[in-house]
């Protein structure tokens, strides 16, 4: 039943992403990072959405910095959380541009901004009207908001389709 699927979908949105202060502030090994990613976005994203080889590739192409002594810190986790959402709809090149723009004042500020944008999109969607572009914003800010919105819409669409099949 579609209304039930829509209610369930709203419960599964990514509103539970951790705030910066709630991200572990100790170094985590790769297996711990993967487990955290699975738990953070379950059930919004499929289990196994982030793999060791993906994380290694993100380091290799420069999307995230190299870990210090094989340990990943808060900045790595925040970057991986943003990548995990954005990759649902965007190319790695687009994700790289968005992350550079988001994090130009540091990863903590960028992650906070990312969370604020996703929260605004989710709140607007529940109200039936997306108000992301109502105020005067430059092209870069519009691209940031549009990219996040595209990723969230892709995630929500996939989950709705899964709910309809169930």
Language model features with spans:
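Short amphipathic alpha-helical interaction segments
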Residues: 48-57
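Short, amphipathic alpha-helical interaction segments positioned at domain boundaries
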Residues: 83-102
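Single conserved hydrophobic/aromatic residue that forms the stacking wall/gate
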Residues: 1-10, 14
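Intrinsically disordered, low-complexity, charge-dense segments enriched in Lys/Arg
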Residues: 101, 105-166
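Short helix-start
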Residues: 67-82
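DNA-recognition alpha helix
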Residues: 27-45, 59
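Glycine-centered, phosphate/nucleic-acid-interacting loop/turn motifs that mediate DNA/RNA or nucleotide
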Residues: 62
């Amino acid at each position: 039943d579609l209304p039930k699927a829509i209610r369930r979908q709203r419960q599964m949105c990514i509103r539970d992403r951790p705030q910066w202060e709630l991200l572990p502030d100790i170094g985590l090994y790769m297996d711990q990072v993967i487990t955290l990613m699975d738990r953070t976005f379950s059930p919004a994203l499929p289990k196994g959405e982030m793999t060791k080889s993906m994380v290694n590739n993100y380091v290799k192409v420069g999307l995230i910095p190299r870990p210090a002594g094989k340990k990943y810190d808060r900045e790595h986790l925040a970057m991986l959380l943003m990548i995990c959402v954005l990759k649902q709809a965007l190319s790695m090149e687009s994700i790289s541009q968005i992350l550079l723009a988001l994090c130009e004042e540091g990863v903590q500020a960028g992650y906070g901004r990312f969370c604020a944008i996703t929260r605004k999109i989710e709140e607007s969607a529940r109200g039936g009207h997306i108000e992301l572009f109502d105020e005067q914003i430059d092209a870069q800010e519009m691209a940031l908001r549009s990219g996040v919105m595209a990723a969230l819409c892709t995630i929500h669409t996939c989950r709705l389709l899964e709910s309809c099949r169930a």
